[in-house]
Design a protein with these regions (language model features):
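Low-acidity, Ser/Thr- and Arg-rich intrinsically disordered low-complexity segments
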Residues: 2-18, 22-30, 35
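Short Pro/Gly-enriched beta-strand edge/turn motifs at strand-loop
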Residues: 63-77, 139-147, 277-284
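A structural signal for short hydrophobic beta-strand segments in well-ordered beta-sheet cores
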Residues: 93, 120, 132-134, 162-163, ...
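Cys/His/Pro-rich metal-binding microdomains
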Residues: 106-109, 125-128, 141
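N-terminal pre-ligand scaffold of iron-sulfur
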Residues: 34-121, 151-179
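Short acidic (Asp/Glu) patches
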Residues: 143-158, 293-294
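C-terminal catalytic domain of Rieske-type non-heme iron oxygenases
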Residues: 34, 39-40, 54, 100, ...
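Short cysteine/histidine-rich zinc-coordinating motifs and their immediately flanking basic loops
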Residues: 119-124, 138-142
């Protein structure tokens, strides 16, 4: 599929950025907003935001959306079933003889033996305890231990969830509308054939993991704190961040969630923007790619309250994320690569990096002292992993003192909490739950624009010039 520009569906229905009045410069509004944000994070608020199991406020909200579950490459036709932990539920995933994916509660509905032990063969998964067999929709198709005149397989169903696949990603819908699920969201990065997807498990709650993506002021310290402006070429995408490590922000509500624009004036007087998004219920778009030519999306999928799985999806018409592939002026790479542990078969055995809490994430104090890395940790992803996991399995929000540069975090928490409680109280959901094109209003990245232009003007001008990708008809199991 060749790149195509996304065409708006008309002013009345196009995804929008909420028009918020600009406040005059000065510390008072930001400080007041941050004080209010800290007060708002009461114990019940924190619980409602972070807990994701069945029956929880956030867990039930997330179940109304399609959820990335696995890479398509992880499941082979008639291959080994895979344990899958999602939203606190222990599931089993498999691909049948026809290539369709099934995702079930791992317990056989007969006597609760785990279907992970089962035989994936001849268009279904068979429990090894008594031989009961189920197709990908959870229908019992064989009950061989029961005499034919007594069998009741038409009345037995495994707890199966709807699945679909698109461009290398397996999706699952865990909500109530199993017979009529909502449309698959048009997350632009997932619309690009041949996109790049990688996964990484994080041993902490999903919220603190996600918030690292929408906290742009940490970049000047955690990731490039060791650099001076003269270390980078004049056109290096990270140079404005190194020159000015304390950006100003504009934050907006959007139909898809929230967005921020972090801005700094560069050497020639232009405004350097870094724009990023939060998209309901657990997606981010980070500002590290080129806005005009590359789409990126990152899903922070809760496995349970203490573990999350990152699905990083990107694609475009350039060479990739400049923050990862770029070098210093002297030709030395900015970051090292990280290594994975071999995947195992336990509930938390997939996509773990080698450097984790057990070895202080590979911290090298000499590297920290001599300026090789500000953190002493050589990989940019593991730098993020270290600080978010070091907060504990679930951050104790009562300890926090949010700063003016945390506006995006405070706004996103508020949006999430209000949306999840609105669904609990009235069944109301944000637009993206039913309108898949809502998410097409979001594109992240860095760009230069004329000084003094408001965020909306700069963003819309760049969006109109950007290469876009559109959806193809989806397929569902």
């Amino acid at each position: 599929m060749s790149p195509a520009r996304f065409e708006s569906r008309g002013a009345a229905s196009a995804p929008t950025i909420s028009a918020l009045a600009r406040k005059s410069p000065g510390p008072s509004p930001s400080i007041a907003a941050c004080t209010a944000a800290r007060a708002f994070m009461k114990a019940q608020d924190s619980t409602d935001l972070t807990r994701v199991g069945p029956g929880t406020v956030m867990g039930e909200f997330m179940r109304q959306y399609w959820i990335p579950a696995a890479l398509s490459s992880e499941l082979q036709a008639d291959g080994d079933p895979m344990r899958l932990m999602l939203l606190g539920e222990k599931l089993v995933a498999f691909r049948d003889s026809q290539g369709c994916v099934g995702i079930f509660d791992h317990r056989c509905p007969h006597r609760c033996a785990s279907l992970y032990l089962g035989r994936n063969e001849e268009s279904g998964i068979r429990c090894v305890y008594h031989g009961w067999k189920f197709d990908v929709r959870g229908n019992c198709v064989d009950m061989p231990n029961v005499p034919a005149r007594q069998e009741f397989k038409d009345k037995v169903h495994a707890k199966a969830y709807r699945t679909t696949e698109r461009n290398g990603l397996v999706w699952v819908y865990m909500g109530r509308q199993q017979e009529s699920p909502p449309p698959l969201p048009n997350i632009e990065a997932n619309l690009i054939p041949g996109n790049e997807i990688w996964c990484l498990q994080r041993e902490c709650n999903w919220l603190q993991a996600l918030e690292g993506d929408i906290d742009t002021s940490h970049v000047g310290f955690l990731h490039v704190g060791m650099l001076k402006p003269e270390d980078l070429d004049d056109d290096h995408p990270m140079r404005p961040t190194v020159i000015n490590r304390a950006p100003e922000y504009e934050v907006r509500n959007t139909d898809w969630g929230t967005m921020y624009g972090g801005f700094r004036t560069n050497d020639d007087g232009q405004m350097s923007w870094r724009v990023a998004h939060f998209m309901f219920p657990f997606w981010t778009q980070t500002p590290n790619a080129r806005f005009s030519s590359r789409a990126i999306a990152r899903a922070w999928v809760p496995m349970d309250d203490h573990h999350s799985m990152l699905f990083d999806i990107s694609g475009g018409v350039d060479e990739g994320n400049p923050a990862y592939v770029s070098k210093r002026r002297n030709g030395q790479p900015l970051y090292e690569k990280f290594e994975y542990e071999p995947n195992t078969n336990d509930w938390h055995g997939r996509w773990r990096c080698r450097d984790r809490a057990h070895n202080d994430w590979g911290l090298d104090r000499q590297s920290q002292r001599d300026g090789t890395q500000y953190t002493g940790i050589g990989n940019i992803t593991i730098q993020d992993q270290a600080v978010t996991e070091s907060m504990g399995p679930i951050t104790d929000h009562d300890w926090e003192h949010l700063a003016p540069t945390d506006q995006m975090i405070a706004r996103t928490r508020r949006r999430l909490l209000l949306a999840a409680r609105a669904y609990r109280d009235s069944g109301e959901l944000p637009p993206g739950a039913s309108d898949p094109d809502t998410f097409m209003g979001a594109r992240a990245g860095s760009f230069l624009f004329a000084p003094d232009a408001p965020l909306e003007q700069a963003y819309q001008a760049q969006l109109e010039k950007a290469v876009r990708w559109t959806a193809q008809p989806e397929e569902r199991a």
